[in-house]
């Protein structure tokens, strides 16, 4: 089965109608392709960070995530956004599971700056993703 990676930004992930339409298309093709789905959610991270009194810092258009803000990133991207998408995809008949790059050491990397949790990926481990795909999960 061919593998397809789909990456969307947070704005698209927040558009329920567009995301539902994408899920329906993916469901129609799920017997031909193994889909891997990656989502953003930066605006929601910024919003929730402000609730906790944390200010989002950007350098050259890239978020500079502090250790404190990393907790918010995990909550928003690995929790709220992730489960919202899993539930929506499940409604379209897709076997969905939500994980993060930290799970199964899918991605490992190095910080781009001292004291920042923003990094660059320097290694990938697809074992967990392959196991899920072999069992029919997105």
What are these regions (language model features)?
Residues 1-138:
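Nucleotide/pyrophosphate-binding catalytic subdomain
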